[in-house]
Each structure stands twice: as C-alpha cells, then as structure tokens.
Amino acid sequence: MQLGMVGLGRMGNGLVRRLQVAGHQCVGYDRNAEAVIDIVEAGASGAASIEELVGQMVAPRAVWVMVPAAFAGSVVREVAALLEPGDIVIDGGNSNWRDDVDLAEELAPTGVHFVDIGTS
C-alpha cells in the first residue's frame, strides 16, 4: 500500500518508519525540510510540497494528515482540494470531533473520503 504523510513530527515520522518496516510505500511532506530528509534516509520518498506529495502518488490515494489540531482543518482542506473522487484524506491529530464531523460533511460532495482517527 502507498500512503502519503503530511506532518513529519514525532508522531508522523514514527508512523512512516513503522509503515516502511511493514512493507508499505510512504511519501512524506513537512514544512521542515530536515524532517523530510530524515524519512528519505529511512527509505521513504520525500516531497517539497503537498502538491508534489499528491503528484507522486497513484490513485486511489490515501493521505494522512498529522499536524497540530489548530492547523488540521486547513491542511485537510488543502490536501482534499488536490485529490480526486475515491481518494482518502485522514485526520490523525487530536482535532475536536465536531470539527471533523463538519469536515466530513464538507468533503462528502467532492467524493473524497474523510476519516477521523485521532491518535493523541
């Protein structure tokens, strides 16, 4: 399976590493270029932007967003705008569940699937 990861802090980096060990292909992006270099050195692919991350992936895409809750909604929207019907965007942060219900309703007409899997 191929998975995109937006946000390569402690949790996103750890998830990419575990997924790579399990045999999955990962593409990662973080606004901190050093975080991207770190996962590339661990065997993942890196991207310099969210657009590049999506462009490296094969449909149907699954993009996991692991950013602080304050930024999750805007990043999920940015990712979803680049996806196609049938793709999946995952909010893995600790966003308020009500915000995620609203995001799911907002994205439903686009055909992009939204999954809330709070991990912290």
Report the location of each language-model feature.
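Beta-loop-alpha module in the N-terminal Rossmann-like domain of NAD(P)-dependent dehydrogenases
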Residues: 63-79, 96-99
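Fold-independent oxyanion-binding glycine-rich loops
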Residues: 31, 50, 67, 92-93, ...
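Class I S-adenosyl-L-methionine
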Residues: 20, 37-40, 80, 101-108
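Rossmann-fold NAD(P)-binding glycine/threonine-rich loop
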Residues: 85-88, 92-120
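NAD(P)+-binding Rossmann beta1-loop-alpha1 motif at the extreme N-terminus of oxidoreductases
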Residues: 1-61, 86, 115
